[in-house]
Every structure is written in structure tokens, then in C-alpha cells.
């Protein structure tokens, strides 16, 4: 959520910035009308509350003197209904203004390139050289079918489309990848391993901005009067650990990682990547989350992105780093780097990690704060999140980049300790 002061005092300027940077149209006239009504009703509410308090005090004083208080009581009763109605109206207006605020995306950093979509993203660097094959390259679906590793048909019987059953050595490789990533981030990168719930409440999703805007992409459960959501990413529970908390300055940056299942309805995917495991309703990811001081978040963002890069480098997977343009960034982000891994079957780079600095946008929603030792007062923290990395897509990249002519897969050296020393799987 943006600073409410921007909405109150600079709505026209804010609307122009949102229009040019995000393609978002803010209804300034509606906002100004609501704000004018809020101010008017708030003034009247405060007048009535002050009057109630003064008359209540007068009643107490009169009773202490043994005087008749019926006239004062009648006066209080006369404006009590107006006060109640005024308080209800004020709450309703605040809710309407908050609903508008919750639907406004974050403002991009000044150094984020302007653009409409992924075609305007700016490549920052590349690592590794794509392998030249002397045989016909198979994609992960063909490799999986050839070896009996990936079973979409059985998964469809069990759950429908966009699910996959992994069997045998490929299931082991998938598990090895997740273990390798968690060990790397905890052992070398200083993140604390955290095991989080896969079901969260609506407040958690509002805190990290999935609600209310992206509800259609969430899986929702209801048991009796209890409603919970399956997490779309462990960013949600990890970041919400500091919701309504004041973190001591010496604990920052707070770095957490979690390997978890993730669940997405893919409502806006438009039928893309229906073949194979690129885009699934259920997938696994190793997530990185940092809570930092505002002045440190830029450096923390660079560090987090580098931690994700190291995963790909240790696996020997060629990739490129891309700075997302204003039109391709996520709703909550101030700035985002994507890492895209090389897939030989597509002869292109595909996203495998997205690392974002959200500034104080999520923290304001969550009231996640830190105590500034310079002032002794609580201030909004900055939140960052990134994939470190998507496990299924890493498995796809390993399968395709390390495939052999006979359909076997060479196990990357970094994974062999997790595979019982196996050098190939077939």
C-alpha cells in the first residue's frame, strides 16, 4: 500500500505517475469526493464526541452535587443517534478509501526502465555458454516420457490438467535440487531455514498484496466457518511472520528461506505452457525473504539476486539476468530482477527466478516495523522476496541441458552428494 499522504495531498500527481509508469488509471475525482466527505464527517464526528465527553463530565459533576441531571441527559440522548450514524458513515468512507488504496500498485524506482511488457525488459548480464548438441535435442516432456519419469496422464486422472506425477530417479533428482538449494542458502548465504504453513488466512494474503487483486489465482478452502487459502508462494507466510511486529534493529536484515509447495490457479495464463511442467497448479520452490532497514534494501536486493544466481552457476546452467520494465513488474515491487535459464529445446531463456524489492509497500499493509535506534521510534521496514529457485523449472533445465543421446541425464556434480553418488540417471 502506498503512503496515504500521497492519496490525500497529491492525488493528481500520483495519478499521473501511475498512468505513465504502470498504465494504472486512478479515479482522482472519486477519490477526492470520498476524501472531502471523510474530512467533513470526521470533523462533525469529533465535534459530537467532544460534546458527548463534556456533557458526560457535566452529568458527573451535577450528580456529585445532588442536582437534577434530566435536562443534560435529554441533551445527550438528542445527539447520540447522530453521533452513532456519523461514526458508522466515517467507518464506511474509510473502508471505501482503503479499498481504492489496496488496488493501487507500487511505484517503480527511478532507475526502472519504462516499458509496456516483457519485450521492454533490459538484459543486465549473461553467464555460461549454451551447449552445442551433436544429436536431436529432446524437451523435458519427451525425455520424461522416454524414460517413464513424468506421468501427466495419471496426474490428470487424479487431479486434472496442469499436474504431473514424477517417478523414480527424476523424483529423486527433484528432491535433490530442493535439498541442495536449501543447504546452499542456509550454509553459505546466511538464510534461516523456516518451515511454514501451506494454508494461510486472508490477512496474510492482504499483507503481501495477493488479496484483494489476485483472488482469482488462489485456491481457497472452507471448512465450517473457517476460510483459508493455499499459498501461491512461501513469500506469503515468511513475510507475514513480521506482521504487526516491531523488529529490533540488531536483528536486521532478517533473512529467511523455505522450501514449500506452491499452488496457483493460473487464471491469467491464457493457455500458455499447457504442455509439460513449465506452468503447474502445484509446484515447489525455495523462497528467499529479507526484512531490512529502508537504507539497506537496495544492497539487500542485489545480494538476494546474487544468491539465486549462485544456484544456477553451481548447477552449471546458462542464464541471463534481466531488469524488468515498469509494465512487467509485479504489483508490489519497486524493482525486480528476473533470472532466465537456457532451455535448449526452446532455444531461449525462460524465467526461473524473480527477485523483488517491495520497499515499504507490503510493510505498510502488514504494519511490519523496526525500531530505529537513532529516534527510538518504530518505522516501516522494507521487504524483499525472491525465488532461490523454482525447483520444477530447475529440474527441467537440468534434464534438457544435461541430456545425452541415449536419453539419459548426466547428474550435475553439485547434486551427486544428494543422489547417492550417481553420475547419470536413465
From Swiss-Prot:
Its EC number is 6.1.1.11. Pathway: Aminoacyl-tRNA biosynthesis; selenocysteinyl-tRNA(Sec) biosynthesis; L-seryl-tRNA(Sec) from L-serine and tRNA(Sec): step 1/1. It is found in: Cytoplasm. GO terms for biological process: selenocysteine biosynthetic process; seryl-tRNA aminoacylation. It catalyses: tRNA(Ser) + L-serine + ATP = L-seryl-tRNA(Ser) + AMP + diphosphate + H(+); tRNA(Sec) + L-serine + ATP = L-seryl-tRNA(Sec) + AMP + diphosphate + H(+). Keywords: Aminoacyl-tRNA synthetase, ATP-binding, Cytoplasm, Ligase, Nucleotide-binding, Protein biosynthesis. It holds the Pfam family tRNA-synt_2b. GO terms for cellular component: cytoplasm. ATP binds at residues 264-266, 351-354. L-serine binds at residues 233-235, 287, 387. InterPro entries: aa-tRNA-synt_IIb, aa-tRNA-synth_II, aa-tRNA-synth_II/BPL/LPL, Ser-tRNA-ligase_type_1, Ser-tRNA-synth_1_N, SerRS_1_N_sf, SerRS_core, tRNA-bd_arm. It comes from the Bacteria. Catalyzes the attachment of serine to tRNA(Ser). Is also able to aminoacylate tRNA(Sec) with serine, to form the misacylated tRNA L-seryl-tRNA(Sec), which will be further converted into selenocysteinyl-tRNA(Sec). PANTHER family: SERINE--TRNA LIGASE, SERYL-TRNA SYNTHETASE. Homodimer. The tRNA molecule binds across the dimer. Belongs to the class-II aminoacyl-tRNA synthetase family. Type-1 seryl-tRNA synthetase subfamily. NCBIfam families: serS. Consists of two distinct domains, a catalytic core and a N-terminal extension that is involved in tRNA binding. This is Serine--tRNA ligase. It comes from Stenotrophomonas maltophilia (strain K279a).
